Amino acid sequence: MKCMIVIPARLASSRLSQKLLLQAGGKSVLQHTYEAALKSSVAEEVIVAVDDPRLAAEVDSFGGQARLTSVDCQSGTDRIAEVALMHEDINILINVQGDEPEIDPKTIDAVAKLLMQHPEADIATAACAIKDRERVEDPNCVKAVLGDDHRAITFSRAAVPHPRDGLTDALLNAEPPNYWQHIGLYAYRREFLLWFATQPPGRLEQIEKLEQLRAIEAGKTIVVAPVEASAPGIDTLEDFRAFTARIESQ
């Protein structure tokens, strides 16, 4: 199977202006993400799907491949679907967010390989165990509920599964884990992705603001790769400063 990593990159950002172009350690955030993606052992190609010529110029400056996509794309998934239309020979497309410069290539590989191992699945993604009460209860920490054989039952911002009798230490520390933090990295089968991009947002998706629920509502199969930890993304100036400090300390 042929795999391609696509990094959807949008210039505008509500909380941190043009964050993908910010420099840390002599490289842009976008270049750091691109170079991390290149370390994947499963992808034959890495492409950045951009919405602005300035991002395309940045990708060109560090020798990467950029594809200019429509400004009308409503999400990164839509940008990846546009790239999928250009590459009929690709079987699996992997979505790596442009603002995750510390993404672990092993996580990328684990997600792609899991999709290959499950021909019945449409999407693969990742999650790490949660042992911290605050994260379980934090709506900004998206939880994945897992069934047998890596299947995702649902995703939610709520504390799910909900502990009727209270969240005890026994529930938090159980093995296998009861609580999983979803990691927003996806591998899609090309035919599924092209279908998905034509579908309107689902009812649950609109309530939770979680795009993956569109697939769950439609009865599609999502498999989840368990990984050790999630990579910190860059959403705020504080996130960027922390990333810069880590880069400069290396």
Curated annotation (Swiss-Prot):
Keyword annotations from UniProtKB, A to Z: Cytoplasm, Lipopolysaccharide biosynthesis, Nucleotidyltransferase, Transferase
The organism's place on the tree of life at top rank: Bacteria
SUPFAM superfamilies in UniProt: Nucleotide-diphospho-sugar transferases
Pfam families hit by this protein: CTP_transf_3
CC per GO annotation: cytosol
Family affiliation: Belongs to the KdsB family.
The protein, known as: 3-deoxy-manno-octulosonate cytidylyltransferase
Lineage, opening ranks: Bacteria, Pseudomonadati, Planctomycetota, Planctomycetia, Pirellulales
